[in-house]
Amino acid sequence: MNAPLAAGQTSRMIDLHCHILPGVDDGPTSLNESLKLARFFVADGITVVTATPHCHSSIHLLRSDILPHVSAFNRELKAAGIPLIVLPGSEIQAFNSAAYRREFEADVFCHLGDSRTFTLLEFSWSEELFPADSVELIKWIRERNMRPIVAHPERHHYFRQRPELLQPLVDAGAWIQITVDSLLGNFGPEAKVFAERFLRTHRDAILASDAHNTKRCSGLSAGYAWVTEHLGSERSQDLLDRAEMVRMSLMAEQATIPTIQSKAG
Ligand SMILES: [Fe+2]
């Protein structure tokens, strides 16, 4: 049974960025830990998550790697009686636009929900690897009718120091994913200030946990509560409505594409 929900909180929250699959990347190392995280999510009011293991230079997980893990974990959730739906996805790092485009066109990436609607895009932690043509890359993705969601820019020192790098990405159509732990100050004051400022000045944002385990996860309800307290209930509701729109879109697409089970074959 879910925990009581705070005012304004929905019982159908979706987390679009989390590392919940056991033994796949730098998330939980055991099935028990993943199930513990799943129970935490359910108690938090989350019903759907997109599992987003890393796809970067050292952990380069593609849809053929990810889909079987998602299928297997959904079976474990069902067996454990945990009412959480896990959809496929990945956190795809773009440090070389040409390489990104090549893999995108080869259809090897696992976008959110394994669909062609939303994709979670991360930039390198190193400014030297931030592509000079990142705006063109965002436009290129948008031309393919997909919405890139840029993962946690508030945690990247170069976006904080040079916000002029981020604004053109937003202008080109990217949405921005803010991590709840940033708002709560768990990644330091600079990330917190940047995240708050962004949410005050931009509508195109999504809250996500970027959970890696039960210790590195504050859930989503704490994030929406923080926004309600500091930015008002209207802003919090707007963020919830946007996430709900994504949830409905991804769930609707699950019915139109082959099942995760059959795709994992
Ligand atoms: Fe992540």
Map each language-model feature to its residues.
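An N-terminally biased module of ancient metal coordination in phosphate/nucleic-acid-related enzymes
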Residues: 1-82
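Catalytic metal-binding/acid-base residues of hydrolase active sites
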Residues: 19, 55, 92-93, 126, ...
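Non-catalytic positions within long, well-ordered alpha-helices that form the structural scaffold/packing
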Residues: 42, 142, 199-200
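Extended substrate/RNA-proximal surfaces in nucleic-acid metabolism proteins
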Residues: 62-177, 258-265
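Short active-site-adjacent structural elements
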Residues: 184-188, 214-220, 247
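Short acidic/histidine-rich active-site segments
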Residues: 203-219
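Mid-to-C-terminal alpha-helical segments outside catalytic/metal-binding sites
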Residues: 221, 225-265
